[in-house]
Amino acid sequence: MVLTELKASGEAPQWLTVEGFQSLSKGYLLPGETPNGMYRRVSKSAASYYENSEYWENKFYEAITKNWLCPSSPVFSNMGTDRGLPISCNSIHVGDSVDSIFGKSHELAMLSKNGAGVGIYLGDVRGRGASIKGNGKSEGIVPWAKVYDSAVVSVSQGSTRRGAAAVYLPIEHSDIEEFINIRRPIGDVNRRCMNLNHGICITDDWMRSMLLGDKQKRKLWTDILDARATTGEPYLFFTDNVNNQNPECYKALQLPVFTSNICTEIFLHTDVNHSFVCCLSSLNLARWDEWKDADLPNIAVRFLDAVLQEYIVKSEGVPGLECSRRSAIKGRAIGIGVLGWHSFLQAHMIPFESFNAMTLNALIFKTIRDKAEEETKILAEELGEPEWCKGFNRRNTHLTALAPTVSNALYSGGYSPSIEPIAANIFAQKSAKGTFIVKNPNLEKLLESLGKNTEDVWKSINGQSGSVQHLKSLNSGQKAVYLTAREINQHAIINQASQRQRWIDQGQSINLFFANNSDPKYIHEVHIAAWEKGLKSLYYCRSEGVIKGDLASRSKDECSSCEG
């Protein structure tokens, strides 16, 4: 049935777009299943883990069909089925032995086979030239990363999407200079990992020493920023910002966080026996006015705790998933995220850089945090505390994490992804059914009200890489509302992220956007501000070439598993 027929028969919500329906049809809907049938399947399965299952099924279904709660891709694909797992990604911790290195390769393969994007921490593996048993010398971490690079490609063959993994290394590691460049298509092909993403873990001590003038560190920092400007990576993981903000239960049990996931929003403990699990879904901020006084964050906590329970049940006895299952049982960490932040601001004619945006930013994320904390306490009393929460009156070590949500934003109504500014006001969205020109719906309404919603106007916007700053029909206030991501002062992105971080117990996927001619000093200052203001990580660095109005907004390097 076509979407219009499904809507007329009550089998699809009115807010579902053609592009969103086609996205769902490509791998989320079961054979013969309608969108509302999928929402019912997911709701019913989640509710089955509670005593009053009919009540919770209806609560979950209502939240989803109202377009308030937006489950992640793996939840829609696999919840209530026997075909896969409903979680988004994992991260593994590699020990300094051949046994651990290859044992974790098997774990990586099994996690990838089951649909997860995988983070890989290599910080414990000795560097190049270090002594090994038998009087030999280590070749360093890069050849082992190459093993994982091959595993990701091999295990995903025949899949609907390629596997995805990101390797992380501390900046103090002796192999760091080579590691920075493992994705550059130059040099020895055997020491390049073109199928892996990569991130660097940086301590406060290192940053302070670099800023105080250490020449070697300054050179390394320059190389990192150059690599980010050129390739978008490496991701940055600020080790002390992460661990200083750990929840009290983590601090009491001395559970350090070494690494993140492939989208840099998950910050959970790992060691060789514990691999973390990303259990994600998002709240739709574009509809904040509808649910701000409702119990939606409470519902989301209960929903995701059930999703995690389904993962625990399904993963029992599955080879390679033992470490992830162990972590899920002990901590029950979940990650409530958001989407539609910029869509919400534009619908209310609020500029991204404004004081009003900051005020709402604080109100929204404090509300989500407070209600989520309330519900995890209720669940602890109802279902008990897991091992890592004993004595803390909570069901989950962590509750919130802001994933990228690119796919989720598309199939949930075509809103802006996560807390990110819109990259372009018009772009081409590619799908299996063809290429569709996607226009910013809020801008389209504004132009219509001005009598300027014409093909010529949209062609001119496309010719300006999605910008409206050249339009004489818009006043300065309207132009400020519709600034694109690279036109916005990047300090505004950092300031908003820093402000909301106090109410987010995990982290945020924060992309930065720069024009090709951006002053290197400006790029440096924005990155330093992220660290100084307490951000836990930085995701991609987007140069102007990536953000074109005539290109799809999603990069091939982004992981659909983790898009919350």
Locate predicted features.
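Catalytic alpha/beta core of large soluble enzyme barrels
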Residues: V257-T270, K314, T400-G564
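Structural signal for hydrophobic packing residues in well-ordered secondary-structure cores
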Residues: Y28, S43-Y50, Y61-W68, H106-K113, ...
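Internal maturation/activation junctions in enzymes
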Residues: S105, I299-R325, I329, A333, ...
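Secondary-structure capping and boundary motifs in well-ordered enzyme cores
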Residues: L16, T34-P35, W56, T81-R83, ...
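Gly-rich Lys/Arg/Thr-decorated short loops/hinges at beta-loop-alpha junctions or inter-strand turns
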Residues: D82-C89, G127-G134, L474-L483, D505-S509
